[in-house]
């Protein structure tokens, strides 16, 4: 098989500091590394043709796209890929999985202000029927870096910051809407559960 085989080891440190009456400051540090056990296809010409280069018929935009896809696949086949950055959990101003590489570092701070805890109010919104237990506003700042080699990790850093509104339901779910902006503009996400949760 020409597919790579690799293991990913991710370490995550989260520190919660209570502030005010019921609010929290959270710090998060994630370090993720891919360890290749078997490389995949590394012949760039084979990968270019697999991605349609031979069907471009001298169209420069098509050739550039096929070459870019081939180089991305070559990096994954050679080095593996660790925890990606971008999306609702890490670097929220970027699309899901926007940055990936063999090595990742991510760090963030988030202030979670619980401003209401009346509890028991009925929520009936589209597909959500639940009781509202707590309302929360969050402000966050996050940075991250990916690279193919450990020595390059941290040399190119992407930044994201923003705010969000959350409510904790009686069923235990947390519904979250975050607005973030960063190096490539704004992004809005609606998602269930807190950030930095590992989703299967």
Per-segment meaning from a language model:
Residues 1-130:
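C-terminal outer-membrane beta-barrel translocator/porin domains of Gram-negative envelope proteins
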Residues 165-167, 186-200:
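Outer-membrane beta-barrel "beta-signal"
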Residues 15-17, 111-113, 167-169, 179-181, ...:
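Residue-level signature of outer-membrane beta-barrel architecture
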Residues 20-25, 116-119, 167-176, 198-200:
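Repeated loop/turn-to-beta-strand initiation elements of outer-membrane beta-barrel proteins
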Residues 114-120, 124, 128-132, 136-161:
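Outer-membrane beta-barrel transmembrane domain signature
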Residues 1-5, 97-106, 151-158, 179-191:
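Solvent-exposed loop/turn segments connecting transmembrane beta-strands
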Residues 11, 25-31, 107, 135-139, ...:
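Transmembrane beta-strands of outer-membrane beta-barrel proteins
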Residues 1, 92-96, 137-145, 173-183:
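Transmembrane beta-strand segments that form the barrel wall of outer-membrane beta-barrel proteins
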């Amino acid at each position: 098989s020409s597919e790579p085989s690799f293991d990913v080891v991710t370490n995550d440190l989260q520190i919660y500091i209570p502030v005010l009456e019921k609010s929290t400051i959270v710090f998060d540090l994630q370090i993720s590394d891919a360890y290749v056990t078997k490389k995949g296809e590394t012949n760039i010409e084979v990968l270019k043709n697999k991605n349609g280069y031979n069907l471009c018929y001298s169209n420069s935009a098509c050739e550039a796209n096929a070459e870019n896809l081939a180089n991305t696949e070559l990096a994954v086949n050679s080095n593996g890929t660790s925890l990606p950055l971008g999306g609702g959990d890490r670097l929220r101003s970027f699309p899901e999985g926007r940055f990936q590489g063999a090595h990742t570092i991510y760090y963030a701070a988030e202030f979670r202000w619980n401003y209401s805890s009346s509890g028991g109010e009925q929520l009936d919104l589209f597909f959500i029927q639940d009781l509202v237990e707590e309302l929360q506003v969050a402000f966050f700042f996050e940075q991250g870096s990916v690279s193919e080699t450990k020595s390059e990790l941290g040399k190119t850093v992407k930044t994201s910051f923003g705010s969000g509104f959350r409510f904790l339901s009686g069923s235990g779910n947390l519904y979250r809407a975050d607005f973030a902006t960063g190096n490539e503009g704004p992004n809005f996400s609606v998602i269930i559960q807190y950030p930095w949760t590992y989703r299967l």
